[in-house]
Amino acid sequence: MTRYNFDKITNRKGTNCLKYDFAVERGKPADVLPLWVADMDFPVSEEITKSLHAAVEHGIYGYTQPKDAYYNAVMNWMERNHNWKTEREWIVKTPGVVFALGAAVKAFTDPGDAILIQNPVYYPFTNIIRDNDRRVVDNTLIYEKTAGQSGDNGYRIDFEDFERKLEQEHIKLFILCNPHNPVGRVWTVEELQQLGEICLRHHVIVVSDEIHNDFVYPGYEHTVFATVDPRFAEVTVTCTAPSKTFNLAGLQISNIFIPNEKLRKAFQTEIDKTGYDEPNALGIVACEAAYRAGEDWLDQLRAYLLKNLNFLRNFLQEKIPQIHLVEPEGTYLVWLDCSELGITGEELDQFIVDKAGLWLDGGSMFGPSGAAFQRVNIACPQATLELALNKLKAAVDNLK
């Protein structure tokens, strides 16, 4: 068994890397330390590298389509790791989950229609809705900081508001995030059941973004929304990709599961309108290798991420108690409650950049309820995380 060294620091600068090479273009100092965008500072697994090397050495990168080995790897992964027995014809390939969200918005709603999301949430949800001339309706998650201090995440769904919004705003589409980015909730079967029943009552289609489904911390379990009830599967578009799990975002491949044939055809029609047909040749290779032989690497990675999370928690408690960790149940993106610093929104964002020298994701990006928060990516060597936390401590210590 290969032992992977996640402590090793890999220099990503000069690789056209969005995370490290575009600070100035995005209004940040050139020397800012980035822990923002959701990719990892770890090389991929040995199996993926070997498969890509073989494909590169072949030397021809023509038009490609996946065959049986690809689909079997994807379906076996979902059954093995997420207890979901799928069928090949359910799978629609897209270059990414955000691309798929846009296709779903156009396939299942009309301009002017309302689409419901749960802020604070991954900001492309809002952008995709508005950019396609639809209306954003927000079922804001309830946050109780005292719950988080006792070990609970602190976020929960306001189900009364959820159903009221569906009815009053004539919602056609709900975009679910499970696990939820950025707050880190992994929704329970009971919560998903309640959401699904409400959506069925109001004839709402669910697009479930489950791209972080392989990152769940001990004591929690990810449940595919479509598996909770066969009726839910008939109204659900489930979005998955190997990009977050195996650090393959740049290879642009995702797998969208749509059991309902009518919904699948409508979705595929929108994909066809974009002219997208053949997936990235190397993306196919990497995805198949990851799902076929990536579990050992992933198991080691999960253990390392847990160490990083524990390190972060202890550091904040001991050295920066003004910043509260919203205990994540899943994802390697951690939500920090900075409300005790007394600054929010743009002022907080600028403090993080100018005084701490860090590039995090400001909470306001995820919705108004995130103004006092910052999102930090802990998928990096622990030395990088420690450096970032020391910079943050120095800035907070000097905050007047």
Question: Predicted regions: what is each one?
Answer:
Residues 34-39, 53-71:
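A glycine-/small-polar-enriched, mobile loop at the entrance of the PLP active site in fold-type I
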Residues 9, 61-63, 225:
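Short clusters of hydrophobic/aromatic residues that line enzyme substrate/ligand-binding pockets
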Residues 59-68, 74, 157, 288, ...:
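Short secondary-structure boundary segments
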Residues 1-19, 28-31:
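Conserved PLP-binding active-site segment in aminotransferase class I/II-type PLP enzymes
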Residues 4, 27-33, 38-54, 85-87, ...:
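PLP-dependent class I/II
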Residues 62-95:
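Conserved N-terminal alpha-helix of the aminotransferase class I/II PLP-enzyme fold
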